[in-house]
Structures are given as C-alpha cells and as structure tokens.
Design a protein with these regions (language model features):
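Extracytoplasmic gate region of multi-pass secondary transporters
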Residues: 29-30, 221-276, 338, 342
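Helix-breaking motifs and short loop linkers at transmembrane-helix boundaries and internal kinks
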Residues: 41, 73, 94-100, 128, ...
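Structural signature of the two symmetry-related core transmembrane helices
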Residues: 76-90, 294-311
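A late C-terminal transmembrane helix in Major Facilitator Superfamily
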Residues: 346-383
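Helix-loop-helix hairpin linking two adjacent transmembrane segments in secondary transporters
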Residues: 139-189
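Juxtamembrane intracellular "pre-TM" segments in multi-pass secondary transporters
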Residues: 2-4, 192-228, 252, 423-426
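Cytoplasmic helix-loop-helix junction between adjacent transmembrane helices
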Residues: 104-143
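Conserved MFS/SLC helix-loop-helix module at the cytosolic interface between two early adjacent transmembrane helices
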Residues: 60-96
Length: 432
C-alpha cells in the first residue's frame, strides 16, 4: 500500500497530465485554425464563433456541475469528464459541416467543464493550506505546458495525419488517460478507509466545515463576486492568447506554421513558469507570516496588472522579437493570476464547497472568455490588425484587478463543526 506522500504525488501527477491533455484538446482548433478555414471555407467571424462555442458551453455548464462535483467527488466527476470530452474531440475530426463542428465544440465545453473545479476539490482533500500553494502551482502549470507543447506536437500530428487525424488521435489519448485515472486514483477518503487510518490533523487549519447549503447561496457572499468578476480578466486574456496567438504571429508578422508553433510554445513555457512561481511565492509568503488570503490577493492583482501592462505595450509594437518577449512576459504574469485565483478558492471556502465556489468563479471567467475570440475576430476583420484587441484585453485585465482589490475580503467567521482551535485558526486565514 502506498504512503500518503506517494498518493499526494500521484494526485499531482494525474491532475497535471489531465490538465495537459485538456489544454492540448482545447488548443487543437487554434492550431488548426488556418488549415480548417482554408479547407472548409470558414470566415474569421465563423471561426470566432466556433472557438467561442466551447467557452460559452464551458461557462454555462459550470453552475449546475459545481454542486454535482461536490456530491459525486473528484474521482467520478473527473473521470466522466475525460470520457465525454475525449469522445467529442475525436468526433471533431470526422465531420465537415459548420453547424456540426460548432455542436461538437459545445459538447467539448460541457465535457471539460468539471476538470478544474474537480482538481481544486482533490487538492483541498489531499493537501493542507500551507502546502496547497505549491501543489496548485504544479497542477496549474499544465494549463500552460499543454498549450506550450501543443503547437509543435499538434503541428507534427497535422503534418503526418492531417487536421482530422490530429483530432482523432488526441481524443484517443484522453480515453486512455481516463482508463488509467479510474484504475489507479483514490480519493483521500478511499485511501483512509482501505488502510484503516485516521486522517492526521492539519498543521494549519482549513476553513471550518459548514452545513450543506444550496450553491446559489454563495451568490450572497461578497467574495463570490470578487472571484467572479476578478477571474473574468484572467480568462479573457488567457483565452484571447489561446485562440488567436498563432493567427496573430502568422497574420501580423508573416511567420510560417513551424516558426509560429515554436514562438507560441515559448510564450506558454513562460506561463508555466509563472504558475509554479505563484505557488511557491504564496507558500513562502505564508511561511513568513503573511495571512493566507492576503498572499493570494497580492499575487493575483500583481499578475493581472503585469499582464495588462505588457499587453498594452504589444499593441503599439511592430518588431517581431520585441512582441515575442512582451507576450512571454504577458503569459508569465497572467498565469500567476490564474494559478493564484484557484488558490483563493481553496482558501476562503471549506472543502465541501470548493467545487461549487470554483465553478461560479469559472462561470464568470468563461463568460468573458467566450467573448474574447468573437470580439478579437471582429476587431481584426474591421481594423486589419490586432492592436485594438490587445488594448481591450489590457483594459479588461486592469478592471479585474480592481475587482479583486475592492471585493475580496477575509470571510466572516462561521460556526466550526470541528475543534474550536480549528475554527479560531480558520477565521484568521480565510487555491487551471
């Protein structure tokens, strides 16, 4: 029987791999963007609609799925999610009608919706507060490493299999990973039951457990709206880059498919570094005495403002090397915000409400994210460049930083159902 430490490491590994495959699949359409437009005669606006179909479905699936994840648990929710989205991904390579492809993107969005709320729930079960930042940083690095390896890897698949074969193959990879997840992963409750052990007391207490309430009650809390509005800027900027960054380098700077692939990969590598830095920085700040929520709040605001600044500079820069450097810095900072936003989820609500709260946050983020591809496509078609699109993104990110600053506060004390010491500590504390 594996030790608790080995299962913690296995949890991080599984969630990391699932995150990588998740982002490979959602990146596939942006990588095949130009090829599909030429092959099927799809306009930039139609492509924007197709790209946004995923994020709209993803966003509106969040609210009902959050409470369901809290009831089903991360193992069943995440495994079922993998199967549904992998089937949708594989089927995308088998159809040609614009409406059929939009429908499959909708199914992909529904299938992927439970992934990160489920991951946040799994981390909240396996990791204590003072070690959760680093764990979250490593898991959320997958949201950048997936897009980082996507351009060269998916381009390689396209060269040898065509864009249709690329979609089928990536779908099959997801189904294999789903089988491994069901075969090997155990929740902490399952592990404790099988080993007959009692869960050790956390060295730093978690938010106290609360009576089960409807997820809609979370909308009455100020912090819910802070996370909802704040995450809008994070996902708007991420989704603009995820869906249009390859097209930007091809259209604005005349890079071919191979050069574009490597440049985009470099930008996402910087994003992955940002998520790991965010996790380690938050844990280090807490170890030095900063309040848990304060450490998260500082990092998420810093990331949004840094991302906004460098994106704004890109809008007025024409040199390709300078644009690559600036976009790498943008991805570094905005992914600091992305990882930290999920650490906030695990900080201000107890474990049994993590998926519900995280789903509401994701709903807000992907409402904005669903607008980004369409608005960017419209802006490019009307102006002939990406400058306006980048300026809009910078403004949205800056507004979200203000929302985090103004609305995110230490949560009100709740009656603890555990020990009184845990409750007192939790009041003081209250993380892709």
């Amino acid at each position: 029987m594996r030790t608790i430490k080995s299962y913690k490491n296995l949890t991080i590994l599984f969630l990391f791999l699932i995150g990588v495959v998740n982002y490979l699949d959602r990146s596939a359409l942006s990588i095949a963007n130009t090829s599909i437009q030429k092959d099927l005669g799809i306009s930039p606006i139609q492509m924007g609609v197709m790209l946004s179909a995923f994020s709209i479905a993803y966003a509106f699936s969040q609210l009902p799925l959050g409470a369901l994840i809290d009831r089903l648990g991360s193992k069943l929710a995440l495994g079922g999610s993998l199967i549904v989205w992998s089937l949708a991904q594989a089927a995308f390579g088998l159809f040609s009608s614009f409406h059929q492809l939009v429908a499959l993107r909708v199914l992909l969005g529904i299938g992927e919706a439970p992934v990160f709320p489920s991951a946040a729930k799994a981390l909240s079960e396996w990791f204590d507060t003072q070690e959760r930042g680093t764990a979250t940083g490593w898991v959320w690095s997958s949201t950048c490493l997936g897009p980082c390896i996507a351009p060269p890897l998916l381009t390689l698949f396209m060269v040898h299999l065509g864009w249709r074969g690329m979609f089928v193959l990536t779908g099959v990879i997801g189904l294999v990973l789903a089988a491994c997840w069901f075969a090997f992963y155990k929740s902490k409750a399952q592990y404790m039951a099988q080993t007959g052990r009692e869960e050790p007391a956390p060295t730093q207490a978690r938010p106290p457990a609360t009576p089960r309430v409807r997820w809609t009650a979370l909308f009455k809390e100020r912090n819910t709206w802070g996370a909802f509005l704040g995450f809008m800027g994070v996902i708007y900027m991420i989704w603009l880059n995820l869906t249009w960054l390859p097209g930007y380098f091809e259209r604005e700077h005349g890079l071919d498919l191979y050069r574009t692939a490597w440049v985009v990969s470099l930008a996402y590598l910087f994003g992955a570094i940002g998520t790991v830095v965010a996790g380690k920085a938050c844990d280090r700040l807490v170890a030095r005495g900063m309040r848990v929520l304060a450490s998260r709040k500082m990092m998420v605001i810093m990331g949004l403002l840094g991302g906004a600044l460098f994106t704004l500079i890109v809008a007025f820069t024409t040199n390709v090397v300078a644009c690559v450097v600036l976009l790498c810095l943008t991805m570094f900072f905005i992914n600091i915000s992305s990882a930290t936003a999920w650490m906030i989820v695990n900080t201000i609500v107890p474990s049994e409400r993590v998926a519900s709260f995280g789903s509401i946050q994701n709903f807000g983020g992907y409402l904005a994210g669903s607008i980004a591809p369409i608005l960017t496509g419209f802006s490019v078609q009307q102006t002939g460049s990406f400058s306006s699109a980048f300026m809009i993104s910078a403004v949205v990110a800056a507004c979200s930083a203000v929302a985090y600053f103004a609305l995110l506060k230490e949560p009100a004390p709740r009656p603890a159902t555990t020990s009184s010491a845990d409750g007192a500590q939790a009041v003081g504390q209250a993380s892709h």
